[in-house]
Amino acid sequence: MHKFRYSLHQHYSKRNSSDKSKDSPISQNSNEENDSTKLSSSSLQDLHDDLDDIYNNYTLAQGTNNNSVDTLDSENNQAINKFIDKPPAIHGMEPQLPVMHVSSRLSSLGNTTNETGESIAKSAPGTPLSSHSFDFRPHHPRAVTNSSLNVLLDTPNVSSEFNHLVDQTPPNESVERFDDSNNTVDNTEEEENNDDTDEIPKSETLKQNEENWEKKGAAVKTIKTMDGEMKTIRRNVTDFKFGKELGEGSYSTVILATDKITGKQYAVKVLDKRHIIKEKKVKYVNIEKHALNRLSNRLGVISLYFTFQDKDSLYFVLDYASNGELLTLIKRYNTLNEECTRHFGAQILDAIKYMHDNGVIHRDLKPENILLDDKMRIQITDFGTARLLEKKNDESEEYPVDVRAKSFVGTAEYVSPELLENKYCGKPGDVWAFGCIIYQMIAGKPPFKATNEYLTFQKITKLQFAFSAGFPTIIRDLIKKILVLQPSRRATIPEIQKHYFFQSVDFKDFDSIWLSDPPEIGPYKMTAKSMMKVPELNKAPITTVIKKNVKKSTNSNSNTNNVATAVGGSSSNGHKGSSPTPEKEPSPATINNKSTEKVSAASVAAYVLNKPATNQNSSTSEDSSKRSSNSNETRKLSYSQQDYIPGTNILRPQISTRPSVGSYVKTTPSKDRKTLTKVPSNIHQQQEKVKPKVMEVKPATTLEAAWEPYLTHPDERILRIGPVIAHKEPTEPFEKKNKASLHISPLDINKEQRSRSNTSLLTQIVNEVNNNTSELKKVENADESLAIIEPQYNMKRSPTSDSKKSMDIERSASTSGSRISKKAIFKKLGFSHLEKNDSEESNGPSLTEKPQTCTLVVTTHGRALLFIRNDIESNYLLIAEIKLKYPFIHFQELVISQTKFSKLVPSVGVFVISSIDNSLIFEVEKFEVNQWTEALAKSKYNEIGKR
């Protein structure tokens, strides 16, 4: 029941004129205005009469149509709403009270009057039915839009009109007149309208208003026909038949629609005006429209045909891509083969170039925004976050390369590092996303993927990505040139087009890129061809070295030319182990004259090693030449064949050819012959210079003085010291559990530590193993106990380590054997507490049982010391010493923290010192991880450089 609100004051004051008020509501209003008599005492009978009078006035009035909704005021006090279809009152019929279904939300609504005097409906604040929530929709809306789904509903949202019209059937006469005036309606439509009991009748004014919107918001396009005549095309909502929903975005819904005139299918993007303004998306809608206007009518980019609107929505009529998204294709096959990657990659690259040439930066390139049409050609869509560039000046036809970004846009896995760190967005950002897409086609997943956006951004800024086993070498080389942190060093579109991977693609031929049939689509399978090195990178540098040696040696001696060719690796004599014997030894004067020229150190060394001895026979010289050539070949192989991909036994691709050994030695003019006879000693100097540069010893500070008892050499200094939370786990299960989260760290080591012709850390470690074969012939045969020393646990067996290695370290066989056997017996019997004293002695702080708060000290002599103490007053206890010089000791960063604080405190970082059997895991602040791993790497290579 409605709450009838009526003023008793008005009815008591007009008690004397109650009879007149029944006949005429006008006289009643005059009595209400002129009567100012005060309330007087009355009997119960008078009150009863007044109530009857109220009821009769509301329900039994003749000749009037009382259309009140929430109040009992007469119709003269109501604001007229011209959008409500009110059936006329029929004389002689007594109107019945409508049966109302009142919800909890609509029952509290009332009519208010604005400045213009029109009635405005109110609903709960912030709901889609609230007309006061939006400034541009004051009254008479036609449709309700769900803000999350953006689905248009054919239901009015003015609540007062809803209260009046729901469940109220208009008279038969009006229905008949409506049917007579609309003879064009089909019978099927009449049946559907009759079945739809929830449909609300619309007034003629509302219908006329909608028709005006259709005309006013229609799209008008002028085209030129084949006959040369100009033809105007007009399209609006009624010209399309809408079908299934294709997808939805953040502020729009894409629906498949068919043009009723031509029968062509389009993808219509429906954008609700209310939601756009409420969510402040007007800017992005305008950007998308202007970007599509710049780029339409060209293969590779979705085309915009019409834009029109009605009272509630905007409509973008776009190309219909029947084969869906590129991401769906990748997920269907898990990966794509190299031919598909080349075909689609060339189309994407050509489309990006077209966008950039027209001053549009997409900024959100990803497989979800790349569609495939009916002929499997790519179409880039979703330009809502694009950046439109302005030309540098009025005369220039070029657009700037990058601009300052005021807002963060894009998807986490594909966003460029310069946008994260410097807030710059430009053309290199789209190239970065292109590299990520190429990677995803082959690997099946983006290169930078983590559990949340924060960790993903950390991976991007640190360039932490890895190639899966069997990743094609040529594509790997391409991605390495694209995924570069500095935009200025990143490969440009012309450089990518000239890459060996796209060698078979003619980017100048438009038809070969866009009109050729796509290759057979299938998953990527590793083949011998895919793992071959890039031919152009292998041939060019070697050829130049050979020419250089030939040119510089022909002037002095033809025999030296042959020797240089053998050293270069192109001659077959070098492989056979023989070299020609020089006919004549050059004089010192000749050597001095030629010393002013730049002579390759490798050719000089080869000449001296193959020079015949004066006091020896020819057989001795031949043997020495064989040994020298073989040593040169093995030295080259040791430097070129040991660069493996981390975690696999696959060689890393040789992106830049390594210079010869002689390039590391400064060539100086030789003054006498003695300098040439001492070349073998210079070779040892070359090997020493190849090693990392030793850090300069700085004066000792109070820090070294405090930790002097634990420093083994007067020159040993402390690189870093700080608190850590450490524990120990077996290496194999730990790496299996965190296989996808472990990454080699640090990635940005200084060039001084990577002085071996810019080789990787793993290559340096392997080369160090080859240089120290006297100590460790094989990494597999190395003993971890030499690298990780635990003084407090030599008499204690670690429950997680292998039994053989941990039981035999500095242990007395008789004592330890009896103790272990006694413990084992009592443990089986359940009386292990009898050995309480022994257990108390051995139960010190253990890194295997639970994480311990320790102090880690890293020194310049390749040592990492781990200390622990119970309280502040007690002394430090050395529980572990790690010698970092061994090749099986390496450092990693665990990207996904497994601590209990990972959900609450995302700043916790983890780094690992891994060995053969055990790994030490350290928890520190997130920003300290790179600092610790850099200190460990410096310590390691400083110790290696001194050897």
Swiss-Prot record:
Q: Where is the composition biased (Low complexity)?
A: 550-579, 618-632
Query: What EC number(s) are associated with this protein in UniProt?
Result: 2.7.11.1
Q: Which residues form the Protein kinase domain?
A: 240-502
Q: Where does ATP bind?
A: S250, Y251, S252, K269, D319, Y320, A321, E325, E368, D382
- Annotated region described as PIF-pocket, given as residue ranges: 271-316
- In this chain, composition skew of type Polar residues spans 108-117
**Comp. bias (Basic residues):** 1-14
Quote the disruption phenotype from the UniProt entry. Sensitive to cell wall-damaging agents SDS and Congo red.
One of its GO biological process terms is:
intracellular signal transduction
Stored Gene3D superfamilies:
Phosphorylase Kinase, domain 1 (3.30.200.20), Transferase(Phosphotransferase) domain 1 (1.10.510.10)
Enzyme class name: transferase
Tell me where it mainly resides.
nucleus
Q: Which CDD domains match?
A: STKc_PDK1 (cd05581)
Which PANTHER family does the UniProt record give? 3-PHOSPHOINOSITIDE-DEPENDENT PROTEIN KINASE 1-RELATED, SERINE/THREONINE-PROTEIN KINASE
Q: Which family does it belong to?
A: Belongs to the protein kinase superfamily. AGC Ser/Thr protein kinase family. PDPK1 subfamily.
Protein name, as recorded: Serine/threonine-protein kinase PKH2
The record lists the organism as Candida albicans (strain SC5314 / ATCC MYA-2876)
The UniProt gene name for this protein comes to: PKH2
